[in-house]
């Protein structure tokens, strides 16, 4: 609650937090719009595969590209001794793992926007960060970090967390959507989408359930919440319906168990838009365990389920890169992540969208071949399932029926890729359901790094 005042102190002392940004797309551009308005922060370098595009985005938000070091050399960025925090915002999970591990080797804190990477190896990334004496954090502004924030608020206030999650526009047949069909579901023509510069594969990754699976995986691994055995349920409802929906089945809700992660649909089963939905937001449902607490809920007008036991706190929107500075400040000033894996509890695995043929090439989230499904980590490991974040560019060795999860044995994968090595290491070294609360919070180890950061001059 004191981040702004501490940032002003850093500004006054002439020792700002120095940022290196890898990837200058939409999220990064939104963050760049806020950098000049935030005291105590300096953007030191940008690395992007298309430097001219990065310069264009800087101009778009009113910044002079000549004032920044911009190149396509991410290795130079992570090695720069003046940089305190690396923001990984490429959206490419395989590349992101390489960038993050290199940043750790150079003793850089990391704010990871590429949740896809966290979903398939976040628990081990967190461990590697702790071993390096740095902080690894999910990015505030992306829904997983906001959910982690709400869960932490509830627990710090003494409330048991019954459920937490996000909203989504969902109907079951969306799971088969492809980049060719996506715009009809959004009410756009392909021409309108083209003129708007919209990426059909990226938008489809939200629609087909891949992003919700990825993001709730990150939430489970960071908070200790767990999925239902069959994955996400997507019950439809408004904000006011949340306390009633997010309670155990035996009490009239939809939850398999207390402590579940879930996604609420903004559409009825008939496809009708629900008023006052949580589509772009996040929520946490918590429990009043005593008559006194439940009476307090009633006295202060807290919206609950009919029993008065379950209540909800929520944000109806998230601001993407515009609020990423919260992570930068938390990591740079306090040495604390805004969400970080504390164990391996869930996984986002690749599921065939249609009958896939031998020798077909997988095209990853939002594409034509696979979508994501949230599963418990022990199921993923026990069945040798293929994580969605790695299901791209690999050839199928055998047919896979529509609706079936893919396994490692179904694909010809590159065993030498850094991301594959890390994932396979996690499968052998991190027990499913594990709870290692020290991950991502190496307070003693990172203290010298924080002191060195504070002593730097602009």
Residue ranges and their predicted role:
Residues 1-61, 216:
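N-terminal Rossmann-like dinucleotide-binding module
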Residues 2-8, 185, 189-445:
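C-terminal catalytic/substrate-binding lobe primarily of soluble NAD(P)-dependent oxidoreductases
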Residues 49, 91, 115-118, 141-142, ...:
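Short, ordered loop/turn segments at secondary-structure junctions
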Residues 50-80:
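Conserved N-terminal Rossmann-fold NAD(P) cofactor-binding segment
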Residues 72-105, 116-122:
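Beta-loop-alpha module in the N-terminal Rossmann-like domain of NAD(P)-dependent dehydrogenases
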Residues 95-102, 115-135, 139-142, 152:
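Rossmann-fold NAD(P)-binding glycine/threonine-rich loop
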Residues 109-111:
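A short hydrophobic/small-residue beta-strand
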Residues 137-207:
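Rossmann-like NAD(P)H-binding beta-loop-alpha module
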């Amino acid at each position: 609650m004191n981040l702004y005042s501490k940032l002003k102190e850093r500004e006054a002392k002439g020792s700002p937090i120095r940022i290196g940004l890898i990837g200058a797309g939409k999220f990064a551009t939104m963050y760049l719009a806020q950098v000049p308005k935030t005291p105590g922060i300096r953007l030191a370098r940008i690395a992007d595969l298309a430097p001219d595009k990065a310069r264009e985005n800087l101009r778009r938000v009113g910044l002079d590209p000549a004032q920044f070091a911009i190149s396509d050399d991410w290795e130079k960025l992570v090695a720069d001794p003046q940089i305190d925090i690396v923001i990984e915002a490429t959206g490419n999970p395989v590349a992101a793992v390489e960038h993050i591990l290199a940043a750790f080797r150079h003793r850089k804190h990391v704010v990871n926007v590429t949740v896809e990477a966290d979903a398939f190896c976040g628990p081990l990334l967190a461990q590697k960060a702790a071993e390096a004496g740095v902080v690894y954090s999910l990015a505030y502004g992306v829904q997983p970090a906001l959910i982690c924030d709400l869960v932490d608020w509830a627990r710090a206030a003494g409330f048991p967390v019954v459920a937490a999650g996000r909203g989504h526009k969902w109907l079951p047949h969306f799971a088969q959507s492809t980049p060719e069909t996506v715009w009809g579901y959004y009410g756009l023509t392909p021409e309108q989408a083209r003129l708007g510069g919209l990426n059909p594969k990226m938008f489809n990754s939200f629609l087909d359930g891949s992003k919700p699976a990825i993001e709730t995986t990150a939430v489970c691994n960071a908070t200790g919440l767990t999925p239902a055995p069959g994955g996400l349920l997507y019950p439809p409802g408004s904000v006011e319906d949340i306390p009633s929906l997010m309670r155990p089945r035996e009490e009239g809700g939809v939850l398999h168990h207390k402590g579940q992660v879930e996604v609420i649909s903004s559409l009825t089963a008939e496809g009708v838009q629900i008023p006052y939905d949580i589509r772009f937001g996040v929520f946490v449902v918590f429990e009043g365990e005593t008559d006194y607490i439940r009476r307090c809920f009633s006295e202060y007008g807290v919206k609950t389920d009919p029993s008065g036991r379950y209540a909800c706190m929520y944000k109806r929107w998230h601001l993407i890169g515009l609020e990423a500075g919260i992570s930068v400040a938390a990591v740079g000033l306090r040495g604390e992540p805004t969400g970080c894996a504390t164990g391996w509890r869930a996984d986002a695995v690749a599921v065939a969208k249609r009958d896939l043929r031998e020798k077909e090439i997988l095209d990853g989230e939002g594409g034509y071949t696979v979508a994501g499904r949230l599963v418990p980590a022990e199921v993923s490991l026990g069945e040798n399932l293929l994580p969605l974040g790695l299901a791209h560019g690999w050839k199928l060795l055998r047919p896979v029926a529509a609706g079936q999860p893919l396994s490692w044995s179904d694909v010809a994968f590159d065993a030498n890729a850094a991301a594959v090595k890390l994932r396979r290491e996690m499968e052998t070294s991190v027990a499913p359901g594990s709870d290692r609360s020290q991950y991502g919070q190496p307070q003693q180890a990172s203290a010298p790094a924080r002191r060195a950061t504070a002593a730097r001059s602009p």
